[in-house]
Regions:
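Active-site neighborhoods and metal-handling regions in enzymes and metal-associated proteins
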Residues: 1-328
Length: 328
């Protein structure tokens, strides 16, 4: 078509996001004489700062998460499986208008380090449960939260990690307002981890994290060893590796923007981000810390920046670890 209109050697502006990359690459290969000029700033701006009507959509998505989370809390007790908890969450949010039943994770083990899809784990006293709700969608707009559930008594180390992560989100939240530096918000969240002796610095470049390579830049090997898992073994399988491969957060940052279904992410809240918050920005802040075969936490809320400060879109379920009595 470009050749037909005499544009095979034209200079052409392109507007899109990362979902357009494969199309642009194909187009460039078919028209090697044409020059394509990036002009996506307007679209990137629209993804970064949301309109009041869009904020309503994100708010609804976050409320669906709260509805699902409350349903998950209601059914969780010793003897219940991860399938049943996941189903309770899914049925509740879908019944109120959620658009997908896949896009979030549940992880249960005695350490608090597991995160994935249900596989048949039976809840037991001492379990730590992570509800990592990375995507619930309303009219194409997504929200994200993370919650922890403790079943009965857990270890002192696990309590320490949960407390530091929870305090981090609450401390960072106080700084949310137009003009606030993203770096400052990130660093405020990691301060309780430093106080707890988990970290020495909030700087991403110095921070250990679960996906980090070896010091020489080579891939980090996952430790191969037998990890007892009665429910996994009841299915004829054996868990023969340790996750995470090393201690730290999943990634060395506090959070990121949320957007339309499909994984839009226009900014990260990290120590190296010197951008400032603007009214209409929507993001999740979730502190994470995992220690192999020991302790883990992933907990956070979804926020929109308002003229006066912020609105916690996921405030309908408390951030603090939900406690289940082991005998119930």
């Amino acid at each position: 078509m470009l050749a037909r209109f005499g544009l095979s050697k034209a200079q052409i502006g392109k507007v899109g996001d990362r979902t357009s990359l494969t199309f642009w690459a194909a187009l460039a290969s078919l028209t090697p004489a044409a020059k394509y000029v990036e002009d996506s700033a307007i679209l990137e701006r629209l993804q970064k700062v949301r309109s009041p009507r869009e904020v309503e959509m994100f708010r609804a998505a976050a409320q669906l998460i709260s509805i699902g989370t409350q349903a998950a809390y209601h059914v969780t007790k010793p003897g219940v499986t991860d399938h049943e908890i996941y189903a309770a969450f899914s049925c509740a949010q879908l019944a109120f208008g959620g658009e997908t039943g896949d896009g979030y994770q549940i992880g249960i083990n005695e350490f608090g380090t597991h995160c994935g899809k249900p596989y048949g784990h039976v809840v037991r006293p001492g379990d730590l449960i992570n509800l990592y709700i990375s995507n619930v969608t309303w009219r194409g707009y997504t929200a994200q939260t993370a919650r922890m559930i403790a079943v009965g008594e857990i270890t002192e180390r696990q309590e320490r990690v949960l407390a530091a992560c929870t305090a981090g989100v609450k401390q960072a939240e106080k700084l949310i307002k137009p003009g606030a530096l993203m770096r400052d918000i990130n660093n405020a969240a990691f301060a309780p981890m430093i106080d707890a002796g988990l970290l020495t610095s909030p700087e991403a470049r110095t921070m250990p994290y679960n996906w980090s390579p070896m010091p020489d830049g080579t891939a980090r090997l996952i430790p191969q060893q037998y990890v007892p898992d009665a429910d996994y073994e009841a299915q004829g399988r054996r868990l023969m590796h340790v996750y995470p491969a090393t201690h730290g957060p999943h990634n060395p940052n506090l959070g990121h923007s949320v957007g339309m279904a499909g994984g839009q992410n226009s900014f990260n809240i990290s120590s190296h981000n010197y951008d400032r918050l603007e009214e209409g920005m929507i993001f999740v802040m979730h502190t994470q810390w995992l220690e192999p075969l020991s302790a883990g936490c992933n907990i956070g809320d979804c926020y929109v920046v308002t003229k006066e400060g912020f609105e916690n879109l996921s405030r309908h379920t408390p951030l603090d670890t939900h406690r289940i009595t082991a005998g119930v």
